[in-house]
Design a protein with these regions (language model features):
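Catalytic cores of Mg2+-dependent Asp-rich isoprenoid enzymes
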Residues: 1-156, 161, 165-274
């Protein structure tokens, strides 16, 4: 491996340590080559998020995301993230269509801020999170793409529950519109931070669905080697613990999401070791 690629991997690992509040704890248990490949996937996903959620005007966001699409189909150039990702794609046969789907998810965030029903939301989650699962499972060495996608969707559903207030500030509501109506919750309730009994019932429903997806997705563990399985179970354990904290607060996420301490996250890693 040449110095340029080594430096690129060093950069994506720094990005992951700095930015990934949960991801870094899972990948720390992987062998070096796999850990660096997953860090490259994370850095790419982070770039998509930073463009879609950043302060650029919509036209420049769209341009930036289309440039990422194009970058996936040509030599990496001098961009450290793309250099590391290109090497990881070669080593682990990370599917290009999953990476393109991730960019499509970022573009969808520019075009849509509401989802009529869960089928529509699931399509979005498949792009922004299921695609990440598909990329990662190539690195883990499993062919269970279906459960990898399901697990990615599960984690995104938990993110949606956790980030309701933050997403509202960005002008987005990911909870399906028909479910808001069914439980008698309005967008005005979200704006007001109204953790009412109706809100609690709605979010209990969201949590139960996320937990069902998580349980199904964890079937992936059966196809993984020990360290890859530990990585995935750590991700899942951290997200499960986050969901439990949110439930314990009565789904009042309007003052910000709960944060797990470093010690708690390390304990979750340790639980997988025994």
């Amino acid at each position: 491996m040449n110095a340029r690629v080594e430096e690129a991997y060093g950069e994506v690992e720094r990005i992951t340590r700095r930015e990934a509040k949960n991801f870094a704890y899972g990948i720390m248990v992987l062998p070096r080559e796999k850990r660096r490949a997953i860090a490259a996937i994370y850095a790419f996903a982070r770039r998509v998020d930073d463009i879609a959620d950043g302060d650029l005007d919509p036209a420049r966001k769209r341009k930036g995301l289309h440039e990422l699409h194009a970058a996936l189909d040509r030599p990496a150039g001098d961009d450290a993230m793309l250099v590391a990702l290109a090497d990881a794609r070669t080593r682990f046969r990370i599917p290009a269509d999953a990476l393109h789907a991730l960019v499509d998810g970022g573009l969808q965030d520019l075009d849509r801020s509401r989802y009529t029903d869960f089928d529509e939301l699931r399509g979005y989650c498949t792009k922004v999170a299921g695609a990440v699962g598909i990329c990662c499972v190539a690195v883990y060495g499993s062919h269970d793409v279906e459960r990898a996608e399901t697990l990615g969707i599960a984690l995104q559903l938990i993110n949606i529950i956790r980030d309701v207030a933050e997403d509202w500030q960005l002008g987005r509501v990911y909870i399906p519109q028909d479910e808001l109506a069914s439980f008698g919750v309005s967008e005005a309730d979200i704006a007001a931070g109204n953790a009412s009994p109706a809100w609690h019932a709605l979010m209990t429903f969201q949590a139960e669905r996320a937990r069902a997806y998580l349980q199904d997705g964890l079937g992936l563990l059966r196809s993984l080697d020990g360290r890859s399985a530990l990585c995935v179970s750590t991700f899942a354990g951290i997200y499960r613990a986050t969901l439990e904290r949110i439930e314990a607060r009565g789904f009042d996420v309007f003052d910000g999401p709960p944060h797990l301490s470093t010690l708690t996250k390390l304990r979750i890693v340790g639980q997988g070791l025994w």
